[in-house]
Amino acid sequence: MRRRYKQGERFVGVGIAMPFEIWEWESEVAAPPGALGDWRDVDVAAEVTRQTRLPAMLANDATAACGAELAHLDRGLHSDFLYFFIGSFVGGGIVLNGALFAGRSGNAGAVGSMPVYVGGRTSQLIQHASLMVLEKALLKSGQDASLLQDPEADWTAIGPPLRSWMDRVSESLAAAIVASMSVIDFPVVRIDGAMPRSVLSKIIAETRARIGRLDRQGLTPFEITAGTIGADARALGGAMLPILANFTCDPEVLLKDVSATTVAGA
């Protein structure tokens, strides 16, 4: 990571997008107990600053993806929406009045922790609508899960595990979306993810169908649409952090400080 900067080079800083509190998800990623514990004591932004001598800003990866989505839209036409990003862990964000809404603690839009009733029991959305769930299914069936690292690949060869996972994702997303609408009447829900667009399109179509079968009495109508960026949304959102911090009238449009350089999020 260390390097010597040439005279004339201009760097605003380093933006980092990553899941928060990853030590809390050892069982979900099949890590041995305690294997991720060391991350508790690592200040990632401070370490990057130490090695690069550049200001480093850290954001939750799903929050960063939501910020990137917002930056690519006409805020006059898309001023309010709920955002889901399906990555290794599902996450998301909230946009209100054309700005990312971080909430009191910076953790607004933590959709992965939302309770959903799926398969006869209540559990968190993250346990259903995450790519790690599909990865576990592939490994259990003896298939190579490395294909999931390429969102541009053809995933049709995965077969039944993919179909089963997509059903599970759409069922849990439908429940989470309808529950969210009872709190804030978003006109639009945008769903994106690190997967082929064909897979995302099928998930969105099935989610719409499942929502149509749920009791939505008392809720205002809303639209469900695909995100505009795809798998790169998290990286683009992270790259935007130093620019937003230095060159916008409202540097907290995506940034919500928890420490000097850390951004909390969904």
Residue locations for each model-derived region?
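ATP-binding/phosphotransfer module of carbohydrate and carboxylate kinases, centering on a glycine-rich
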Residues: 1-12, 25, 50-53, 72-74, ...
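Phosphate-binding/catalytic loop of phosphoryl-transfer enzymes
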Residues: 10-121, 237, 241, 246-266
